């Protein structure tokens, strides 16, 4: 199986490296500009496994012979991917979070169907240039089951062979959207506050974030069924529970706090703003509460 991984960031690098080295896939990397490949060092945080992978030269368009084009770009960059897929007939699998209108717009721009996916990998590149990542046991990479089936089942088998648990399901877009809108308010608050501790010590911001998260969950229930772990975690989230939870995580795995601050904070400010705007629009369209989401968005835009 030939897989074109579109997006050369940490997430795309983990999927590409594991599919190539352990999933028996021929992998190419598609980025904004063609450039030489490089040697990538990957470190799995949760079990200490390391992987050295020499990525091929990057290309600026997915190849005609690819079976799957795996989209791993930021939310605000999704529309810009369209020209990079103009030469391929591959099945388009999108791991980037999408709301239902996003998938419709993206499919229209491509002129063909788009398959929703949901990643299970957490990854970042550290200051030494290594890709550090987690494969949480409770998470699954979901790939939408479509008809006709195409290469989906084979792709899921390759992911599983690579060590990334994966499954097919029909409601992946709804599941992803419901989970995303539930968590984005907390990302918005982290972006506003600048750090986990800043959010936890700012009572007004924390209260606003939790109310916005409640509105996000309400919207999520309209869109679909969020991942079970997400629903359970957010249902019991409160100021005391969050402070205690952060304390436990920091004592056991301080690196995850740094990852959250880097990945969901100011570094992704543009993505946070665009996604927050889309969520407020969806809440307006679906008639769910949005007062706290709107206030938090206003603070995010400052």
Give the role of each language-model region:
Residues 48-131:
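Rossmann-like NAD(P)(H) cofactor-binding subdomain of soluble oxidoreductases
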Residues 99-100, 104-181:
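Rossmann-fold dinucleotide-binding core
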Residues 154, 158, 207-222, 274:
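A non-catalytic, amphipathic alpha-helix used as a structural packing/dimerization or gating element
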């Amino acid at each position: 199986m030939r897989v074109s991984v579109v997006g050369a960031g940490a997430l795309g690098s983990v999927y590409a490296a594991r599919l190539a080295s352990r999933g028996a896939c021929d992998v190419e990397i598609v980025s904004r500009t063609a450039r030489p490949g490089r040697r990538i060092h990957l470190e799995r945080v949760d079990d200490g496994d390391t992987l050295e992978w020499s990525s091929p030269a990057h290309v600026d368009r997915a190849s005609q012979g690819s079976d799957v084009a795996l989209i791993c770009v930021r939310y605000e960059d999704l529309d810009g991917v369209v020209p990079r897929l103009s030469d391929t007939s591959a099945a388009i699998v999108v791991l980037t979070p999408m709301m239902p209108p996003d998938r419709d717009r993206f499919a229209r721009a491509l002129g063909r169907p788009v398959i929703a996916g949901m990643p299970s990998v957490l990854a970042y590149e550290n200051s030494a240039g290594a890709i550090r990542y987690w494969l949480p046991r409770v998470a699954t990479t979901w790939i939408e089951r479509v008809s006709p089936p195409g290469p989906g089942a084979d792709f899921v088998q390759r992911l599983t062979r690579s060590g990334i648990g994966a499954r097919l399901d029909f409601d992946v877009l709804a599941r992803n959207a419901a989970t995303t809108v539930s968590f984005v308010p907390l990302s918005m608050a982290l972006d506003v506050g600048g750090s986990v501790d800043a959010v936890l010590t700012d009572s007004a911001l924390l209260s606003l974030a939790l109310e916005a998260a409640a509105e996000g969950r309400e919207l999520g229930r309209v869109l679909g069924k969020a991942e079970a772990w997400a629903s359970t975690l957010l249902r019991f989230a409160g100021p005391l529970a969050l402070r205690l939870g952060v304390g436990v995580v920091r004592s056991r795995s301080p690196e995850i706090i740094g990852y959250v601050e880097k990945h969901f904070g100011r570094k992704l400010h543009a993505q946070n703003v665009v996604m927050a705007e889309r969520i407020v629009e969806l809440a307006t369209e679906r008639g769910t509460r949005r007062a706290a989401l709107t206030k938090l968005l206003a603070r995010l835009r400052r």
